[in-house]
Regions:
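Solvent-exposed beta-strand/loop surfaces, strongest in extracytoplasmic domains of secreted
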Residues: 1-180
């Protein structure tokens, strides 16, 4: 027998081993040579190869507020289709291409769409980016020494070197000594 594949962009053959190389349709012809008792014979069949569903997966990401921008990278990817990213909450993370920029604490679901290619269907998946709150940096809030009977005085709020908008509150560990 001899085999012939019409479109070798779809399949190739070596002996009687057929290897699929792409999605689409082609015909395969098998031919048998004549012998003393039989004429030459051939038979053609059609081979249809469907596009595959690609594997596309991402790990969830945990960052801290103030972290630098980072690239969202696939954990597993079988297709070469282009990727587009979109986020559910830009106040937490904004997306430009595959770069994520941390904007605030919270969680955002990132949807990733992959385009169709010659051999793979389009697909989509998602991941969650969680941004943790961080402790603010406070300085210039020093111990105070006073003498009993001194008049009341104003406590100056500590200075901060961040964009924290939280309100300062004060409390005394021993209200019998000092009250606020």
């Amino acid at each position: 027998y001899t085999y012939t594949v019409n479109n070798q962009n779809i399949a190739t053959i070596n002996g009687n081993i057929l290897t699929i190389v792409g999605a689409g349709s082609t015909s395969i012809t098998v031919s048998q040579a004549a012998d003393n008792n039989y004429n030459t014979a051939s038979k053609t069949i059609n081979l249809s190869v469907a596009k595959a569903t690609p594997v596309l997966s991402f790990n969830d990401v945990v960052k801290n507020y103030g972290d630098t921008s980072f690239t969202i990278e696939a954990q597993s990817q079988t297709s070469s289709g282009s990727l587009t990213f979109s986020g559910s909450d830009n106040s937490v993370v904004s997306i430009s291409g595959s770069t994520a920029t941390v904007n605030g604490a919270g969680s955002s679901i990132i949807t990733v769409n992959q385009s169709e290619t010659a051999n793979y269907n389009a697909t989509s998946t998602s991941l969650t980016i969680t941004v943790n709150k961080i402790d603010p940096t406070l300085s210039q809030f020093s111990n105070v020494t006073k003498t009993f009977g001194d008049p009341s005085f104003e406590i100056t709020p500590p200075s901060k070197n961040n964009d924290n908008t939280g309100v300062f509150t004060y409390s005394s560990s021993d209200p019998s000594i000092a009250s606020i």
